[in-house]
Amino acid sequence: MDEKREENILKKQEELRLFQEALPRKGRLAGLDVGTKTIGLALCDSQWIIASPAETIRRKKFTLDLELLRQFVEKQQVKGLVIGLPLNLDGSDSPRTQSVRAFAKNVAPLSLPVLMWDERWSTKAVTRTLLEADASRARRSEVVDKMAAAYILQGAIDSFAMF
């Protein structure tokens, strides 16, 4: 294994450890797929076993987006956020990476632990699944963001057991 890859794995393990330490032993987590027009939301159970799509926020301006997210977090009793990080296929930052990192910093008023999670392939995987299920274009556009959020969240909670 090359040195840079090993360094990245160790860094991700440390991020996961810190995130888990900041969380209560049990409680729901929310997954977010942050786009320019929408924010897909997903939830997992309090045991961190299964993630499910929840809803989609149509973005307007950040203060309104944050208020809708705050309401969702309170209603669902969310204890931590897993936010999809849009990286290029080679792992480098994409044009959207910086704006998603800024979004993650701007949700600080929610006072929740935040984990940034590699979201490469999430939307493509979900779209492929929906195509295989013969979902119409309208149905795909209606659910793809919250399903991508569930895909991101499931990846994160699956990794909890590994590290």
UniProtKB/Swiss-Prot annotation:
CDD domains: YqgF. One of its GO terms (cellular component) is cytosol. GO terms for biological process: rRNA 5'-end processing. Keywords: Cytoplasm, Hydrolase, Nuclease, Ribosome biogenesis. GO terms for molecular function: nuclease activity. The keyword Cytoplasm applies. Its EC number is 3.1.-.-. It is found in: Cytoplasm. InterPro entries: RNaseH-like_sf, YqgF, YqgF/RNaseH-like_dom, YqgF/RNaseH-like_dom_sf. It comes from the Bacteria. Pfam families: RuvX. HAMAP family: Nuclease_YqgF (MF_00651). Could be a nuclease involved in processing of the 5'-end of pre-16S rRNA. Belongs to the YqgF nuclease family. This is Putative pre-16S rRNA nuclease. It comes from Zymomonas mobilis subsp. mobilis (strain ATCC 31821 / ZM4 / CP4).
